Structure formats: structure tokens, C-alpha cells
From Swiss-Prot:
Matches recorded under PANTHER family: 50S RIBOSOMAL PROTEIN L36, CHLOROPLASTIC, LARGE RIBOSOMAL SUBUNIT PROTEIN BL36C
Name of the molecule in the record: Large ribosomal subunit protein bL36c
Alphabetical GO biological process terms: translation
An MF annotation (GO) of this entry: structural constituent of ribosome
Organism: Acorus calamus (Sweet flag)
Protein's UniProt keywords contain Magnesium: no
Keyword Hydrolase recorded: no
Amino acid sequence: MKIRASVRKICEKCRLIRRRGRIIVICYNPKHKQRQG
């Protein structure tokens, strides 16, 4: 999980989700997991 100021989709399979006021990216590829901090 990478904590970033700006999160973006890295590939086509990445999904942007809003969870508890935070934007997170989930993907089948674990390297693409991101969270806005």
C-alpha cells in the first residue's frame, strides 16, 4: 500500500473507491494499491 498525495489509476483494472473519506485504489496487482494520505 502506497500512501500518496495524489492517487491515480495505473492500469485498466485499477478501481478508485472512497472509503471513510479517503480515496483508495484497489487492483488485482498488489503493487498498484494506493491510498490518499
